[in-house]
Amino acid sequence: MDVPSSSSSRFSVGSASPSSVLLYAKDLKKWDEFEDLLEERRQVSDFKFAMKCYTPPLYRGITPCKPSDIKSIVLNSEEINYVIKQLSRESLTGVDVLREEANEILEEMSHKLRIGAIRFFAFVLSKVFKQIFSKVCVNEEGIQKLQRAIQEHPVILLPSHRSYIDFLMLSFVLYNYDLPVPVIAAGMDFLGMRVVSELLRMSGAFFMRRTFGGNKLYWAVFSEYVKTMLRSGYAPVEFFLEGTRSRAAKTLTPKFGLLNIVMEPFFKREVFDTYFVPISISYDKILEESLYAYELLGIPKPKESTTGLLKARRILSENFGSIHVYFGDPVSLRSLAAGRLSRNTYNLVPRCIPQKQPEDVQAFVTEVAYKMQLLQIENLALSPWLLVVAILLQNQLCMDFDALVEKTLWLKGLTQVFGGFLLWPDNKLPEEVVQSSILLHSNLATLVKDQVVLKVDSESSQMVNGLVPQHIAFLMCSAYRNQLLNVFARPSLVAVALHMTPGLRKEDVFSCFSFLRNVFSDEFIFLPGNTLRDFEEGCYLLCKTEVMQMTGKDIILTDKGNAVLQFLTGLFKPFVESYQILSKCLLHEEDYFSEKEYLVTARKFTRQLLDQDASQCYDALSSELQKNALAAFVRLGVVEKNKVDSKYVYYVNGPATSKLEEMLGCKKPIGKPATAKL
């Protein structure tokens, strides 16, 4: 595996005078080595593995208790008693009735962690994973750091979320290394799987509703349940910052509800510190790749059921390559808050009284969420297939094999220079690496007479569940390409800004970059308030690859950098063009519309353009992108969002919409950052 060596480079953006401020410095990271834990599993009996002596290290301040004890502690807590009395006065409902309701909520959500269920899953998952994965690779150094952290302070596990099996995989890995299996926040969807949901409960899952609908009692019970487990050190708490799986393989913007809950004991000085552990789970081939494409094209996801699980047994005959699980360094909440946040406001009222979060605390929670996601992204392992599919999507979907290998090697070097965690087998020839990648994804690409062809140019007019096969294949390919964008987002945005800015004055390029970053801030993870630093990072990487040079007030492009610029703008072209298409689509909307109506119209409008060969932008069909675009349109003032009869409706600002479409199409100058909003 090639891993960039540590180095440090610096450059300044701005005046070239001696007094100019050094604005950016970037260190290339060196990652831990991986160990394949399936190697040992293939040598030892699965039953012996499941029944091994399991003595995980415990938090030094642990309060020993059973799952039933946790429920009792929650029901008798000052917080729940206070909320019940408040609600009783407000709703004129008896305290006993509300207490019974709280008990029912707890029965619905709580876990029943038992060692027997953990051993059962260890046995089953060992067999399944050996069948469908070549390797399950884990960085042992990260495991060792986690082992120490678990004994010192309460631990929050924050994995990336790409597949249903993420949480199962994580529990399997922790059991393998004799670490405590976490309690896991799971969606209520799983309750439809009767036997499975009970097994999940007994392996540590606790269930939460997608929305609480203003139910104060539910929120109080749920938050107190999570905080009780955290304060007692019962087990590491695991949840997904994204809230749901990313269907398009890009990290979704974070949800803050659970993060607020687990940070509160620290804010109220109920715990000395809390460790956050970002975990990056990378798949060579995503199990749900076709299911995701269907969902993005408007087909609702199948309801979770035991029958559906049994039907999914067909995946046992497929090869999904390898999984890489990277445990990041534990991050101390106390260290993050030092000099950044005052907890004094929490001393002014009793702990049991719910209080509105101060603005500085809200900003801090938001910042922590984005920082954790950026750490997840930094440690996501990239497979060679991502390079191959990104190149093919920019080369008319077909390419000579030798030319593809040459271009893939070129992109390999660029990815590593940009700081990407690329997994490239050093013991294989480049031709073998590319060929094995194509073979693993033979449902999407094939090698015919020295030509590599993406299987997206189907002549078949036969519909699949009302969908065009070509659209399904394109979105599956796009999902793999999207994984590269985590590494290339900032230099790509600078490249697009350079393309859209006449004259190449640094100030104008920065204005355009700021505008684009704002437009696409729901598509990619950018730390709020970090625009200048993101611009500097993008410029630094383009200077490092000799794409451009910085002078006092201007940017000079080099002939040597044409290939890099062309590739980077090509990576972002689908997003710019998709937002243009959706801007035009808005002008065809009625006076007001719901999100559901917008998605139907957007899909229909885009399909018409594709059918008429007026566009080749298949990414605009993605419902995930369409929702992100709508959020951006609201933020930019292109669309107004109002609540009417408990439902949200949207109104189009016609002139602002036309202006946005013109700006994205380079027909109108962007303007200065202060006036970049529409």
Swiss-Prot record:
- Entry's Gene Ontology BP terms: cerebellum morphogenesis; ether lipid biosynthetic process; glycerophospholipid metabolic process; membrane organization; myelination; paranodal junction assembly; response to fatty acid; response to nutrient
UniProt function note: Dihydroxyacetonephosphate acyltransferase catalyzing the first step in the biosynthesis of plasmalogens, a subset of phospholipids that differ from other glycerolipids by having an alkyl chain attached through a vinyl ether linkage at the sn-1 position of the glycerol backbone, and which unique physical properties have an impact on various aspects of cell signaling and membrane biology.
* Membrane topology (UniProt): Peripheral membrane protein
Family to which the UniProt record says this protein belongs: Belongs to the GPAT/DAPAT family.
Q: In which tissues is it expressed?
A: Expressed in liver (at protein level).
Q: Which positions does the motif Microbody targeting signal occupy?
A: 676-678
Q: What is its EC number?
A: 2.3.1.42
Q: Where in the cell is it found?
A: Peroxisome membrane
Answer yes or no on keyword Membrane: yes
Annotated domain remarks: The HXXXXD motif is essential for acyltransferase activity and may constitute the binding site for the phosphate moiety of the glycerol-3-phosphate.
Q: Which gene encodes it?
A: Gnpat
Q: Which UniProt keywords apply?
A: Acetylation, Acyltransferase, Membrane, Peroxisome, Phosphoprotein, Transferase
Residues that bear N6-acetyllysine: 641
Which pathway is it part of?
Answer: Membrane lipid metabolism; glycerophospholipid metabolism
CDD domains attached to this UniProt entry = LPLAT_DHAPAT-like
Which named protein is this? Dihydroxyacetone phosphate acyltransferase
Instruction: Return the InterPro entries for the record.
Output: DHAPAT (IPR028353), GPAT/DHAPAT (IPR022284), GPAT/DHAPAT_C (IPR045520), GPAT/DHAPAT_LPLAT (IPR041728), Plipid/glycerol_acylTrfase (IPR002123)
